[in-house]
Amino acid sequence: MKRKSLLCLLIICLLLASFPGRVEAATFTPDLSFTGSTASCYVSIRQPGKKITATMELWHGTTLVDSWSGTGTNSLILNETHSGCVSGWTYTLKINGTIGGVAFPEITETATC
């Protein structure tokens, strides 16, 4: 009986040791703001231990205004500007990409110039 209990305890310890203590979810921090006619487009994506690829696009309605791409491991920051935006128009920042080879849902941020 002691032998079986010890064996079960050993198996449980081995199983627990083989799983990570916690799995961190990816964090996304997008921002779209304007200074005069210049759009400031920003996204920070963090996922420890993973390769991140992303494309950040600035849209006005159905028109693609500008786009930028990048790749990183553990984190990726895209911080870009676009001049020539029109006052009163609404723009949308769209972020698409992959984390560890798996596509993440599109992230959007909307603001008016």
Which residues does each predicted region cover?
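Intrinsic-disorder/low-complexity, polar/charged segments enriched in Ser/Thr/Lys/Arg/Asp/Glu/Gln
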Residues: T38-Y42, I77-N79, E106-T108
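Solvent-exposed serine/threonine-rich low-complexity stretches and specific carbohydrate-binding patches
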Residues: G61-S75, E109-A111
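N-terminal prepro-regions of secreted/extracellular proteins
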Residues: M1-G36
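Short, surface-exposed binding/anchoring microloops in extracellular/periplasmic proteins
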Residues: A25-W59
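Short beta-strand elements
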Residues: A103-C113
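Surface-exposed, short loops/turns at beta-strand junctions within beta-sandwich domains
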Residues: T81-T90
